[in-house]
Every structure is written in structure tokens, then in C-alpha cells.
Amino acid sequence: MTPEQQDLMDRAEQSLQAARILADEALFDVSVSRSYYAMFYCARASLLALNLSSKSHSGTISLFGQHLAAAGRLPIEIHRQLIDAERLRILGDYGGANSHCSQQDAQVLIAQSARFMQIAMEFLAQ
């Protein structure tokens, strides 16, 4: 693992830890955002293994889907989870007065981001 990949994985771990703490404090919108970022950092680190990167979130998600999930290098369902996590992050960060993430959203995303991180770590260890 390169130093840049390690830094991204460290950021992912910190984001996941923050997501858990925030969920425990019933701050579900912010928890969802941190879970998304845990997944996003893992996606970026994984793409670097193929010498790929993007300057945008949508570009990173697209490259991840094309070169890692659809190519069979990583499970396809984690790409779908990353897409769904971004949608929830946007809802939590920018949603209106009646648009908030639920406790269930936060709990599901924490579990998914922990699994995403484990899969990314195994991929990067190859």
C-alpha cells in the first residue's frame, strides 16, 4: 500500500469511527455523511491501485463501478451501496426541513461502510 492509499484508509477509519459516535448521539444526518466518506476514501484508495483517480465524487464512483466492480475485481453490490450512500449523504447534507436520514439509514450505512472498508483492505493487500 502506498502512503497515499494508507492516508485514505486512515481517513476512512476515522470517518467510520465518527459515524458510529454520531449515530450514538442521534446525529443521523451527519453520521450518514461520515459513513459515505468512509466508503468514498476506500474507493479512492482502491482506484489508486489501478493508477486511476478523479477530481469529483461522481467521477470516483463511476470509475469504481467500471474498473473495480463491473470488472469483477470487487463485489458489484458495494458499488450500488456507494451510489446509495452518496444519495443519502446529499439528503442529509442538503435536504430540506422535512428531509432527514433516519436511525435505520445511519445503522445500515455504518454496517455497509465497515464491510466496504474490509473488502478494500483485502483488495489493497493483494
Curated annotation (Swiss-Prot):
Gene3D superfamilies: Nucleotidyltransferases domain 2 (1.20.120.330)
Stored InterPro entries: HEPN_dom (IPR007842), UPF0332_toxin (IPR052226)
Source superkingdom: Bacteria
Family designation: Belongs to the UPF0332 family.
Protein's name in the database: UPF0332 protein glr0978
